[in-house]
A protein has these predicted regions:
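Short, ordered loop/turn segments at secondary-structure junctions
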Residues: 26, 87-88, 129, 152-153, ...
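Positively charged, polyanion-binding regions of nucleic-acid-associated proteins
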Residues: 190-207
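Domain-level signal for Mg2+-assisted phosphodiester chemistry and nucleotide/NA-binding surfaces
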Residues: 2-110, 116, 141, 146-148
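A residue-level signal for conserved active-site and pocket-lining positions in enzyme catalytic cores
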Residues: 24, 59, 111, 126, ...
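Short glycine-/acidic-enriched loop or helix-start segments at secondary-structure transitions
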Residues: 32, 136-137, 159, 179
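Active-site histidine-anchored catalytic micro-motif
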Residues: 117-154, 165
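Amphipathic alpha-helical transducer elements in NTP-driven molecular machines
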Residues: 38, 68, 105-108, 134, ...
Length: 207
């Protein structure tokens, strides 16, 4: 069966169910910025609404970061709730200071909690290319949920794309761009396993 027909079939199946959209804002924004592109929140919401009635739409980031200063206003205008996740600076043994946040953990916890508390939601859409979310995907699917991921073609974890029921390329299926004109700069984002995320995932599932 052609991919377009398979996608239409999944959308038709999900259309009678409610939909939740969870956006890893920094992952999506950084990925697109590599090609000097911005996140089109309206297109993202419209894509989610093709799967049914969108009842939850959250975007996760450190909104106090200057880089995200104007983003919450655009998200609110599109009917998407900005969820604040603070960033902390960690000094490694080598003396290198790195910025870290807990978006993966917070988003995963909210998503799994939503699965338990809102059985009316049959479709979960994750806007991220981070392979660490495989744990979350593996939790939702046994509950009969349709799991869709949206990621940028040049920075998405192949492992994540392989685990979801349906994968959409943001730059091809959501907000198409001319990839010959907009070429990503630098290497793709890496997605390593996160022990803290796995631990949080296990705690939430036990609830």
């Amino acid at each position: 069966m052609p991919a377009s027909q398979a996608r239409s079939g999944l959308q038709a199946k999900a259309h009678s169910q409610d939909v939740a959209l969870f956006i890893d804002w920094e992952n999506l924004k950084i990925s697109l910025s590599q090609a000097i592109l911005r996140v089109n929140v309206s297109s993202l919401r419209e894509t989610a609404e093709t799967y049914g009635r969108l009842v939850i739409a959250n975007a996760y980031a450190d909104w106090q970061d200057d880089w995200h200063q104007s983003d919450p206003e655009n998200l609110y205008a599109a009917g998407i709730e900005p969820v604040y996740v603070p960033t902390r600076v960690v000094t490694e043994s080598t003396g290198i200071r790195r910025r870290k946040n807990s978006v993966d953990i917070k988003l995963t916890a909210d998503c799994v909690e939503c699965c338990h508390n809102h059985p009316n939601i049959g479709t979960f859409i994750l806007a991220s290319g981070d392979g660490d979310f495989i744990h979350m995907v593996n939790t939702l699917r046994p509950y009969g949920k349709l799991v869709v991921a949206v990621g940028v073609s040049w920075s998405t974890s192949p492992r994540l794309a392989a685990r979801v029921d349906q994968f959409l390329y943001y730059d091809k299926d959501v907000d198409p761009v001319d990839t010959q004109r907009y070429r990503p700069r630098g290497a793709a984002l890496n997605s390593g396993e996160d022990d803290a995320l796995q631990h949080a995932f296990e705690l939430v599932v036990e609830i």
